[in-house]
Amino acid sequence: MLDVNFFDELRIGLATADDIRRWSRGEVKKPETINYRTLKPEKDGLFCERIFGPTRDWECGCGKYKRVRYKGIICERCGVEVTKSKVRRERMGHIELAAPVTHIWYFKGVPSRLGYLLDLAPKDLEKIIYFAANIITSVDEEGRHNDQSTLEAEMLLEKKEVEQERDAELADRAKTLEDDLAELEAAGAKNDAKKKVQNAADREMRHIRERAEREIDRLDEIWNTFVKLAPKQMIVDENIYNELVDRYEDYFTGGMGAEAIQTLIRSFDLEAEAESLREVIRDGKGQKKLRALKRLKVVAAFLRSGNDPAGMVLDCIPVIPPELRPMVQLDGGRFATSDLNDLYRRVINRNNRLKRMLDLGAPEIIVNNEKRMLQESVDALFDNGRRGRPVTGPGNRPLKSLSDLLKGKQGRFRQNLLGKRVDYSGRSVIIVGPQLKLHQCGLPKLMALELFKPFVMKRLVEKSYAQNIKSAKRMVERQRPEVWDVLEEAIAEHPVMLNRAPTLHRLGIQAFEPILVEGKAIQLHPLACEAFNADFDGDQMAVHLPLSAEAQAEARILMLASNNILSPASGKPLAMPRLDMVTGLYYLTLLKKPEEFGGQGAYAPATEDGPAQGVYSSLAEAIMAYDRGVLGLQAPIHVRISHLRPTAEIEAELFPDGWQRGQTWLAETTLGRVLFNELLPWNYPYVEGVMAKKPQASVINDLAAKYPMITVAQTVDKLKDAGFYWATRSGVTITMHDVLVLPNKQEVLDNYEAKARVIEKKMARGKINEAERYQSLVDLWKEATDYVGQSVEDLYPDDNPIPMIVKSGAAGNMRQIWTLAGMKGMVTNSRGEYITRPIKTSFREGLSVLEYFNNSHGSRKGLADTALRTADSGYLTRRLVDVAQDVIVREDDCGTKQGAVVPVAVPVLDAEGKPTGNYTAADFVETSVLGRYLASDATASDGTVIVAEGDVVGEGELQALLEAGVEEVKVRSVMTCATNTGVCSTCYGRSMATGKKVEIGEAVGIVAAQSIGEPGTQLTMRTFHLGGVGGDITGGLPRVQELFEARVPKAKSPIASVDGKVRIEDDDNFFTLTIEPDDGSDDVVYEKLSKRQGLATLGTGGVERPIRDGDHVKMGQQLLKGAADPHEVLRVMGRRGVQQHLINEVQKVYRDQGVAIHDKHIEIIVRQMLRRVTVIDSGSTEFLPGSLVDHADAVAASKEAVKTGGRPVEVRAEIMGITKASLATESWLSAASFQETTRVLTDAAINKRSDKLIGLKENVIIGKLIPAGTGISRYRNISVEPTEEARAAAYSLPSSFGDGFYADDTYGEFTGAAVPLDDIDLM
C-alpha cells in the first residue's frame, strides 16, 4: 500500500472511462448481492468474490484452496484469488453502461461546468440530457451549400404540389356545393336550408385552405431550420427534427441525451474556443464580457490541467469495494445493507434492461425512455436529490448517495478523517482532588488497569508472575493482588491526557501524572478547572494514553498541566485560586480590631505600666502564641522576619545594597499575612494587605513574569492548599438569617410609588407622550433600585458572610445581594424592553405571582440565548480554525522593514488641560504592544534609544518607554510579515503561553482561532433596542460574526472619503451632508442620510456631541451612528486602514465583556481575510482578469514579468469573509472538508488541483504527521543518543534504602513533576 510519508502532494482530476476500467478488477453484470440460502456472494454480482476478492482470509470461493500456502493462486473452479479478505476494502469493479450518461456534478453544479464549456444554458442542457429536446452535433456546411439550389427547387416543387392539391380539393368542393344547391332549388327548399349547406361548404373550404397553409408553413419552417442549421442548435419540436432527419440526414448529425453531449465534447476545440473568448474579453463589454470571462475560466482549466472534458460524460461507472458498502445479517435472518447497494442495483437493473432492448431492436421512443431512466439512476447514485425528487428507501427516507457519504458532519471527511475514535481511552465523571499536585490527576484503579492492560501484561510476564501473555491476560481479568503492584509500576512516570468536551482551546487537553484512586471517578486538580471550564456537577472527562516514547515526551514536556499555567489568548495565568480558595486566603489576610474575634493579642505600644504587646522575635514565636490562643490570626502585630524578603520600600531604606537571606527586619503585619507570604517564593517582595481575588491575581501574574514555570506551579499549589485549609477554618456559610432586610424599605417604595403616580397622571392629561412616560418610569425605578440596593449594602456588617464572599471576589457581586435582600428592580420582556412595573420584593421576602411572571420573561430569554450562543460560538470557532489552520511559524525572521505603529503612552494633563510632563500607559497596551519586536528604534524626545530595533517589548521595556515618554512605537506585526505561507517568529513576537519568542513550527493560526472562539460563549446574543436609533445596534457574538464575515452592517454608516469641512442640509426625513475637501478638490456629497440613525458623535475636550455644520472631519471618520462597512473602509483607507478597523471593532466587543485577547490573534485572522486580490488587468502574466489570486503570488508573478520585459499584473485589494476565505484556500482537501464539499471537489477535479499538504487539516486527513510543533521536518527523525552515565544507569538498580530517592525535595527528578522547559535542550 501507498505510504503517506513518501509523497508531498496530492492531486485530484477527472477520470476517463479507461482509468475506471484500469482500476477495476472485473465487470459487475448482475444486481444480485448474496445468495439468501448459502449467504455466499453471487457470481458477477455486487459482492462477487471473483471481482473483489475472497470473503475469508486465504480461502477461495468454493473451498478448494485453503491456507496461506496457496497465496496468489487463482482457483480454476471458481476463479477467486487466494489472498487476504482485506482486499475487499480496496478492490473496485465497474459497470459497462449501454448508453453514455453525464456526471451530475458537472452538469447540475453551480455554475454548470458542462453548460459553460458548450455555451448552453443549464435549462437547455437538462432538456437534451433527459431526452426532452434534440441537439445538432455537426453540419456538413459545404455539402449543404453545394446542394442548396437543388434542395430548394425540390422544396418549391413540394410546396407547389401542396398548392395544386389544395386547388383541386377546393374545385371539387365547389362543384359539390353547386350540385347540392341545384338539388335544393329543384326541391323548392327554403332559404334556411340553402344557407346551411352554403355555410357547411364554406367551413370545409376554409379548413382545406388552412390545412394547406399549415403544411406550407411547416415546409417553410423545415427549410428555414435546415438552411440556418448550426452545431449546438437545439430543436425542441420532435416532428420537425424527424422531418429534418428524413429529408436531409446526409447533411447533419444530431441526437439527444448524453450521447449527443459526448459527441459535442469530442469535437470541441478547446484552444480555438479559448482564443475567441480572449478576443471577446479584449473587445467586449457588459454581460457579454462577463459571460466570456466565466466561460474562459472553465475552458482554460481544461487546457491548463490537460484533463479530457470527455470525462464529464461516463461510458462506465466504478463500483466501490464491497466492504465500504457492507451487508450485515441481523437477528431473524433479515439483512441490513448500505443505501449504495440499492442505488447500484437500480443502475444495473436499468442498464441490463436497456441492453436487452437494444438487442431486440425496440422502438426509439422506448429506448430513449430507458436511457433517461438509466441517466436518472446514475444521478441518484452520485448525488441523490440534486435533481428532482430524491430516490427514497423504506419509510420515505432519501437514500444516501456517494456525495452524501462525503458531506456534512456525519460525512467521511468530518466523521472519519478529521476525527476518529481512538483506542487506549476511557471516560468517567470527575470529582475534585484537592490533595493532588498540579501535575497529577486521580485515575480510578479499574480504568487504569484497562488502559494500561498491555503494559501490565508485559510486566507480569517479565517478572515471572505469569508464564505467557495469555495467562497474564487471565490474571489481569481476574484482578489478582499482584496485578495492582505491577500496575503501580506501569503508571509511574507515564503521563495520561485528560480532555473535557467541548475542547474550545488547546488547554482543553492537558497531560497529568496518574495517581491510582479508589472509586470510579476521575479526580481533577482544582486549579486545572478554569482551563477545562470544568465543574463537579456531573461533568465527564475522557482519558487518553500516549503510547510511544515520543508521545510520552511530548505529553510531559509540552502538555503537562504545570507547564500550561498561562492562557495562550492573553498570557495571563489561568491556574488561579478560585471560589473557596479565594475565600480562605482573604480570611487569612484580613485585619481585625482587638475587640473582634481573631483580633486578640494585637500590637500595643509600651506604656509606663509595661512593655509593648504583640511584638514577636520570630514567626515561630507568633505561631506558638496563636496555638495557645493568645494571638488572633488577623490581629495587627510586629514580628521580626529573616527568611522573607522585605517590601521594596523597606529594602530601599534598610538594605541599600540589597537584602540577603538571613538579614532581619521588622514587619508590621498580621500572622495570617506572614503565613500567606510564606507560600510565595522566599525572594519575592513581602506582600502586605488584604488578599482578595484581584490582588491574588496580580501576585500570580507577577510571579509568572519573573519566575520559572515550575516555581509558579509550586506556588499556586501551595496557595490552593492554604486556601482550602483556611476556608474550612473560616467557617464561612450562608443561612437565611444572614440575609438582612432593609427595615425602612416600605417607606422608600411608597415615596417612589407616589412619584410614579404623578408620571401616570401627566400621561393621562396628555402632558407627555408614551415614549416619555416609558423613559421617565424606567429612570425612576432604576433610581429606586439603586437607592434600595445602596442602603442594603450599607446595612451589612463586615463579618457577615454574604458580603465577605463578594468582597473577597470568590463569587457573586453586589447586584446579586441587592436582588437577594433589597429589590430585584426592572426586568425586560422577550423583546428586550423594560416592563414598567418593577419587582419590588427581594428573593428573601418572596415574589408575588405577577412579579414572578414578569421575571420569567427575562429568565426564559436568557436560557434560550445561552443555547443559541453555544452553537453559534462553536460554528464561529470552526470557521476561524478553518481559515487560519495553515498559518504556522515557518522561519525565524522574514527580514521585512515594515510594521504597525501602536500607541504606548499618553501625556497626563493638568486641570487646565496642559501637559504635566508625566505619561500614563495608553489604553490596552498589554494586548497591543507587549510581547512584540520593534521594527525601528524607540527613541525619547532627546534622541536616546530606549529600546533598539529588533528587541522585544517586555514588561521592563514597557516601563522604560513610559518613563521616557515615548508616545508610539513601530512594532513588527503578522499583517506586514513577508513570509509566504505562514508567518515568521519575529513578526509574531512572544508566544503568550510561554512568555518566550514563539518557536518555529508553532501553529499560531489555530491558537489565534481558539483564542477568539473560546470566549465566544461568554459574549451575549446582544441586539440593543434603542428606540428608533436606526433600528438595532448589533453587539456581542453577532457583531463578531458580522465583522469576520465582512458583511455589510444593518445600520450602515457612511465614512468620510476625504479630510474636510462638513456642511449639513436638513431635509424632511433625511440629512444631506457635503464635505468640502481641504485640498480644494470637488465636494463630496452624501445624500439621503437617515435622521432616525442620527449623526455620529465627535469627542471634543472630553464632551461628546453630534457632528455640526462647519465641523472638520478626517478621512475614514464615520458620519452617522452605527457601524462602517468594511468594504468601504478598504476602498477609502486601504489595506492597513481596514485591518486596524477590524481589530478595533472586534476588540471592542470582547473588552465590553471583560475578555482579554492579544491583538496578534485577531491580526492573524484579518491577514487571512485580506490575502486575496482581484486581477483587473493580467498584464503579461498567466492570470485571468476577474480571478481571485493570492497577494503573494501576484507580487511574485509581476516581478517575474517585469524581469522578462513584460507588464506587471494590476490588482485590487479584496476583503473576504472567513467562510469564503476558507473555501478559497489553495488546499482542496481542506476546503472540501469544511463546507460545500461537492462544489469544491468538482472545481478541484476540473482544475486538476494539487494539494501541497502545507496546512494541518490536509495532513490529518491523509494520516500524516502535521507540519507543526514537533511534526515539522526539522524535528523529524531525531533519535536520542544516551550518555555514558545513562548507559551505566540503565543496567544498575537504585538502592531501595536511600531515603533521598523518595524525598520531596528532589522535585522534578523522580516525582514526575514538571521540569522547567529552559532546562531541556530541545534542539
Curated annotation (Swiss-Prot):
Keywords: DNA-directed RNA polymerase, Magnesium, Metal-binding, Nucleotidyltransferase, Transcription, Transferase, Zinc. One of its GO terms (cellular component) is DNA-directed RNA polymerase complex. The keyword Oxidoreductase does not apply. Zn(2+) 2 binds at residues 894, 977, 984, 987. It is an enzyme of class 2 (transferase). CDD domains: RNAP_beta'_C, RNAP_beta'_N. Binds 1 Mg(2+) ion per subunit. The keyword Transport does not apply. It comes from the Bacteria. Its cofactor is Mg(2+); Zn(2+). Mg(2+) binds at residues 535, 537, 539. Its EC number is 2.7.7.6. SUPFAM superfamilies: beta and beta-prime subunits of DNA dependent RNA-polymerase. Zn(2+) 1 binds at residues 60, 62, 75, 78. GO terms for biological process: DNA-templated transcription. Belongs to the RNA polymerase beta' chain family. This is DNA-directed RNA polymerase subunit beta'. It comes from Corynebacterium jeikeium (strain K411).
